[in-house]
Structure formats: structure tokens, C-alpha cells
């Protein structure tokens, strides 16, 4: 996100030319686009499958489980990010033949793409908050096994509302700033000129991601230490999933530090920018994959026939800690 301002009279309304970098090999860039779109679409499918299973197909199994309710909201966040930062961003960045064709149409203020940019950053913060709630949920399941369900049942609608409302405190600078298309690799993608120089969106995100990572490490450590010996095999899979997701958050923190303190408007085509996409993809595509792998019941509900699912659902216990890892 840029402090750089081109030489123009009115930054809010004057056209900003898009310079297409024609030095990139079209075939290689389109190949990058194709490879990424394949796993992005796969990620959208898997998140949608998990979401549909939890909220509709097997609602009677998961509706009383606070962890899976939170995870379904996380799937919604993943789908939103994969559509905006995945399908839209990769198309304009890597499908280079469109740059010379469309460049002239993106010189004026971009209201539609400002909404996309706002949605992307808003949902990214939501995802950090959801990570906090997910690991906190697992920890309370171990520390307060008797009252865990009632605690979360009473507070769940409030914490989910907070997940969507809190990021608004970080959206305002994009809302009042000029969004424009910046040359990125052989294509282009959105950036913005900060109206308020200190209110960097990347720094806002860094704060929330560090909080999420801290909660992840602390809550996981407490969960493992306090977990009854007889339950360790049951919860081991969940803890492994937490560690894997934590690795993704660690990489995300590193990239956010770069964007917060070292990024300049000329770096949009640097390799670091491309690698930051991969860290984001690891979280959004990897999250449902990890959960499907560690939860046999969820895996069965997603991939087995409807009749088998109905039979299995009747046999399942609805205990929060147990149903996750079976």
C-alpha cells in the first residue's frame, strides 16, 4: 500500500495510468495462473463441502458443537478470500494478455475494486480472530469439560458477531483513500494511496495476526499439558492440526512484517509479493484439508452417500471434544 503519489492535481479523481510490463513471458505467466487456479478452485470446493456438511447435510450432528460452528464461519472466510485474493487477483496479475486490453479502463477511481479490497482485508482480520476462537475453544474443552458446552452456547452468537464487527475499526483508511490499479508482474492489481499515512492496513493486520499466533501457541500448550492421559490419543489429531495451521500463521506474520515496515510501491512485482500469496493459500486451502484429514467423521460425512451419513449420524455422540477427532 503506497505513500507514493503521482504528479496530479487531484489524487481522488484524476486518471492514474496503468503501465503493463511486457517483459514477462506470457506462456509462463498463464501457466502460473492455471496452476494456482486449479488448487484455488479445489480449496473453494473443499471449504464449501465442509460448510455444507456442517450447516445443512449433517446439521443434527454439528449444530450443537461450538467448535464446528466456528469452523464453518472460518470456511466462509476462506471462500471469500479465495474468490477475491484468489480468482480475481490471480486473473488480473498472471493472465497477462488482458493487461494491454483493459489498462485504459482502470485509470479512473475504482469503486467496485475498492469494495473488493475492503472485503479482502476485512475478512483477513476475521480469519485471525476466528483462529483465536478456535484454539480457545479447544482449550476450554479440556479445562472446563463440564461447563464447556454451556459457556460457548451462551456466548457463541456474540463472539461470531464480534468477529465480523471488530475488523471495521481497521477498514476506514481504505474507505476514504483512492484505490487504483498498480502494475504487478505482467498484469495489475489493486493498491491504494493512504489518506492517513500512519494507518497502514498491513500494520492493522499484523496486530491481529500476532494476537492470533500468540493465542495459538499458548492455548495449544495449555491444552496439551492439561489434557487427561486417556484423552491424549483422541485430541492428538486436533493438536497436530493446530500446529500445522500455526505454521501457516507464522509465515503470514513474516510477510505482514515485511509489508508493514519494508514494502514500497515499487515492490509489487518482487518475488516476496508472489510468495505472500502462497502463505495465504496455505491457510485458506490447507485449513479444510487438515480438518478433513484429522476428523474421520467429517471425512465420512463429506464423501459417503447420504444413506450412510444418516446411519452414522445416529451413532455419533455429540460431545464437543470427542466428535472432532474421531
From Swiss-Prot:
Positions of transmembrane segments: 36-56, 67-83, 115-135, 156-176, 204-224, 243-263, 274-294
Gene3D superfamilies for this protein: Rhodopsin 7-helix transmembrane proteins (1.20.1070.10)
GO molecular function, one term: transmembrane signaling receptor activity
Protein's cellular compartments: Membrane
Gene Ontology biological process terms in this record: sensory perception of chemical stimulus
SUPFAM superfamilies: Family A G protein-coupled receptor-like
GO cellular component: membrane
Main localization, broad class: membrane
Membrane topology field: Multi-pass membrane protein
Family: Belongs to the nematode receptor-like protein srg family.
UniProt name for this protein: Serpentine receptor class gamma-14
Protein's gene: srg-14
